Amino acid sequence: MMNRASLCRIAVLLCILHLSHLIDSTYAQSYLTEKDFLAPLYDDDAITLSDDDFDNARKLSTEMVNSQKKRRVLSHQKYYRGDIRGRAAWTSKLKSGVRRNGVTSVIKRWPNGRIPYVISSQYNERERAVLARAFQEYHSRTCIRFVPRTSFDQDYLYIGKIDGCYSDVGRAGGRQELSLDDGCLQYNTAIHELMHSVGFYHEHERWDRDQYITILWNNIDKDAYDQFGRVDLTESSYYGQAYDYYSVMHYDSLAFSKNGFETLVAKRPEMTAVIGSAIDFSPIDLLKINKLYNCPAPNTIDISQISGNGWQGGGMGPRAPLPQVNLPLPPPPPLPTNPAIAIVGECSDRTNLCWRWLDRCRSYFFEKIMKEFCALSCGYCVPTNAVSKAAPAIPLQPTLSIAEGPEGPMPPLYQRFG
């Protein structure tokens, strides 16, 4: 005879068998499907640009695309991280790592100039149109092609609102992030970040940059020193092109300033106002892209398209003059003179930075200061008594040598980067 314990075990087994028949087969068994295996290959919110997006891009007027402030958002992001991140930023911090103006490694280039991409579904219609416009300009002026990603593309760009404006440089491998967050969706910012992805660092990081610009270390925040490194000439090429003040890859003169004073000053004084102000590719930008990817395009600039008004090629609008052409910058349009506060007698500006602050001339908070330092530019002078040019500007802070920082010799890391 079976004891009570055995009977209890049999009863439990019978209950389990009975319950198993009551459970639906979909819950009793679960198998991995083809969809489960493919899911990790896709981003949850990823989409691609549609034909409607490209149609909207064509409708964007040149004035609308170009009516934007200078692209200072890139060089004034929080935490001094700059707009180069990912493997490129990590490599630049290694002991043996160096930055390069244009990548020379075949591995870093996108095969045949084909760049698979997806974008975040968070972008609205206007933002997608700006992205599509940037893609169109690459397609029409270079052999670079941004194409929707397929399941066969392991290396691709994911463009999303991640954290500010940044990109890796060249083809990094796998899912490669390019962030164009709120505030970054401007045409010039988009082509700048995409040019990083194509394979280019900043123009002011060229190895020969000290022949063309001066770094004012006294005005740079310590945490941003590595944003002013130099590229390694032995491992890269400038593709036979001169230093390009007009490049869309150049930072502005106030980049990473800790005190509002200039950090980058051009050796040619009139170029200080030019650097970092590009709203489109320069002719040299396009030449370097086409040379890097062996595009079936001319390797020289068509001189017939150069006039006194600058580059007249196709695309977004007027092009900047060639760097070799020394054209004076046009003076800012004079503001209406206010008779009630007009300054009688000899009148002039007391600083060479007034052109940057013209929007503050009639500000309630800044009017008194602007009247004191920028009377001529702000239109506070009586026209008959105004002098024709500004008074001697307040001198900039002294320039330090390449191996010096604002507080003496720079650490080895910064000496290595320039």
Curated annotation (Swiss-Prot):
Cofactor(s) needed for function: Zn(2+)
UniProt organism field: Steinernema carpocapsae (Entomopathogenic nematode)
Protein name (database record): Zinc metalloproteinase nas-8
Keyword Signal listed: yes
Cleavable signal peptide: 1-28
InterPro entries: Astacin-like_dom, MetalloPept_cat_dom_sf, Peptidase_M12A, Peptidase_Metallo, ShKT_dom
Superkingdom of origin organism: Eukaryota
Binding annotation for Zn(2+): H192, H196, H202
Localization, UniProt: Secreted
Keywords noted in UniProt: Cleavage on pair of basic residues, Disulfide bond, Hydrolase, Metal-binding, Metalloprotease, Protease, Secreted, Signal, Zinc, Zymogen
Reaction(s) catalysed by this chain's protein: Hydrolysis of peptide bonds in substrates containing five or more amino acids, preferentially with Ala in P1', and Pro in P2'
